[in-house]
Amino acid sequence: MSPPVGTTGSQLSRGRWAFAFALVTSLFFTWGFAYGLLDVLNAHFQTVFHITKLQSTLLQLAYFGAYFVYAPFAGVFMKRYGYKRGIHMGLGLYSLGAIFFWPSAKFQKYGGFVGSTFVIGCGLATLEVAANSYIAVLGSPKHAAARLNFSQGFQGVASFAGPMIASKWFFLGKNATTLDTVQWVYLAVAGLGVVLNILFFFCDLPEITEDALTAEIAEVGIKDVGPFWKQYRCIFGWVAQTSYVGAQVGVAAFVVNFLVDQGVGISQSRASQLFSYCQITFTGGRFIGVVLLHFIDPALLLSFYGICCTAFAIGVSQATGYGGVGCLFCLFFFESICYPCIFTLGTKNLGVHTKRGSGLIVMGVGGGAWYPSAQGALADAASTRRSYLVPVSGYIAMSLYAIGLVVDQAIKNGFRFRNVDEFAVKRAAVSEAYPASGLLESGESTYRTKTPDSEKKGSVDMVEQVEG
């Protein structure tokens, strides 16, 4: 059997691995900045266009609705043409959407902003499918969640930079009621996208193929993963991601309104600044999560964080004054690891379905399209504080997914607190099952052995038991 075309992260030299990791990680900063500005524009447009909180969530509907529509297509595109071309397409759409913010601001058209945001969302959906999937498979599955948390930590850095910029230039002086600053900020964002596109064109980014990934998991005794519709961990991961992202986006969309309405004398400018501090808390939590995920099983840690998110979201909806503000900061901290953990747990060991599965999980970001609208309707009808009951449902769904994975693992192989290298465990099982050689032909699903067929059947059963 000829070796599979392409490579895997574990086959790269240390230098090429570090280069690929750093280059793809730069993409996380790109969409973190755009996302950080989005929630601030939500409040800014309420003032400039004299629209309600519910109407302002059209931005979230366009941005996250683009993920729902475009992410599956992006996964299919990269399955055929590879990660690098997918990154080029994503950066191109991202820059194009940002450029159209200029005429929208110039002619004061809220609909233009909504349309431009949709195009940006399509670009970022493509980048998320590429970057999240690439980082997840760029090495051992044991550290996939830690790697993705580290890379997405830079998304958090950019996320608090957006509100910080807004607090200085969107809400002060004449900028509080105009869009002059918005158009220049987004022209700079478009320029950043163009520069990154040029850098990726001239850089040698190693292509990690699904054939190579399939061969890698075959080497440790994992049989054919079966059709895509049977990848229940991935399908339920999409449900969990849809619910979680919807909750996260709803929480962030009304932070400025929530802080101003708390009755403790917080202005819009000060609220935007505090929002950036919330994002700093989120980012710090993500880097702390990198350390924790080296030692604690990702599904178990996600279960704990999901329960904490549920509790503090309820706290935000009920507590008044600075008590609610404190619960809000805690909520941002415990949100930190959720998205990367759901992604890596849902796409683990998919083999030939890796890119398609990545597209499905990223499609879950579309949950951010309708949660803010539901929350905005409740905020208009009751209060911003009470509207934070809406995200609670999303955190509960995410927690059930994580707890389900923990229970499933406990039933099959016993309860596991520590994070373990499953590939190493399976290789050891294969070696024990085949003492004559313990080796697989590279890229094959049969073993070199002189063991009689009757003994081989028992050995294969041992391997399949470890797979469970």
Q: Residues of each region from the PLM?
A:
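Extracytoplasmic
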Residues: 19-51, 131-132, 162-166, 251-259
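Conserved MFS/SLC helix-loop-helix module at the cytosolic interface between two early adjacent transmembrane helices
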Residues: 69-111
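Helix-loop-helix hairpin linking two adjacent transmembrane segments in secondary transporters
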Residues: 141-208
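C-terminal ends and interior cores of transmembrane alpha-helices
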Residues: 92-107, 307-320, 403
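Intracellular juxtamembrane helix-capping segments at the cytosolic ends
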Residues: 126-143, 336-352, 357-359
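Extracytoplasmic gate region of multi-pass secondary transporters
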Residues: 38-42, 163, 167, 226-276
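Cytosolic juxtamembrane N-terminal segment immediately preceding the first transmembrane helix
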Residues: 1-31, 47, 226
